[in-house]
């Protein structure tokens, strides 16, 4: 990857294009954006370094420029490495390969995440007591009939129980 170094004129151009930085610089020492060309290099750097906002804006502008330039260099080896480290998920967004959960076909009970084996993985295809317990709980939950009226009634009771507290807090604040 190339090393990018800004000239003072490029920094001034970035500042001139960013109205928020212009306002910030104008407030500092009663300067106006056109006066930036008259500033000595050290003064300009001091103004920029003393402003977190100016620094973040310049970093953002530099990142945009760098990304644009990298995007134009398709034959760049670094880009090929980056592309090989990404895969496209179901939503068509790039995801690093390290975050893929891997299930080995030979033994589905072994699962890795970022290359580390996960110990607590339940294989629902295997018949044993812990899996049966999990299946039983899942079945009970799926068969349970959640009555909306009962839920609303419970919420209303909870609210009514808290009303005196809310009322007394309001009285105290007046």
From Swiss-Prot:
Keywords recorded for this protein, A-Z: DNA replication, Early protein, Viral DNA replication
GO biological process: DNA replication; viral DNA genome replication
Assembly description: Homodimer. Interacts with the histone-like protein p6; this interaction optimizes the binding of protein p6 at the viral DNA ends, thus favoring the initiation of replication.
Origin species: Bacillus phage PZA (Bacteriophage PZA)
Summary of the function given for this chain in its UniProt record: Involved in the replication of viral DNA. It is required at the very beginning of the virus amplification, conditions in which a low number of viral DNA molecules enter the host cell, possibly to recruit the limiting amount of initiation factors at the replication origins. Once the infection process is established and the other replication proteins reach optimal concentration, it becomes dispensable. Optimizes the binding of protein p6 at the viral DNA ends, thus favoring the initiation of replication.
UniProt-recorded name of the protein: DNA replication protein 17
Heme among keywords: no
Similarity comment: Belongs to the phi29likevirus protein p56 family.
């Amino acid at each position: 990857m190339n090393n990018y170094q800004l000239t003072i004129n490029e920094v001034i151009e970035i500042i001139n294009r960013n109205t928020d930085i212009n306002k910030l610089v104008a407030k500092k020492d009663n300067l106006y954006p056109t006066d930036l060309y008259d500033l000595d290099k050290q003064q300009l750097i001091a103004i920029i370094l003393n402003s977190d906002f100016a620094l973040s804006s310049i970093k953002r502008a530099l990142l945009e420029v760098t990304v644009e330039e990298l995007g134009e260099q398709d034959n760049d080896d670094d880009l090929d490495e980056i592309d090989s480290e990404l895969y496209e998920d179901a939503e068509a967004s790039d995801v690093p390969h390290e975050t893929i959960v891997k299930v080995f076909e030979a033994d589905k009970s072994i699962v890795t995440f970022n290359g580390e084996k996960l110990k607590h993985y339940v294989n629902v295809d295997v018949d044993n007591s812990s899996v049966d317990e999990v299946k039983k709980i899942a079945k009970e939950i799926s068969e349970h009939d959640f009555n909306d009226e009962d839920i609303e009634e419970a919420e209303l009771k909870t609210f009514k129980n808290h009303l005196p507290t809310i009322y007394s807090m309001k009285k105290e604040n007046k």
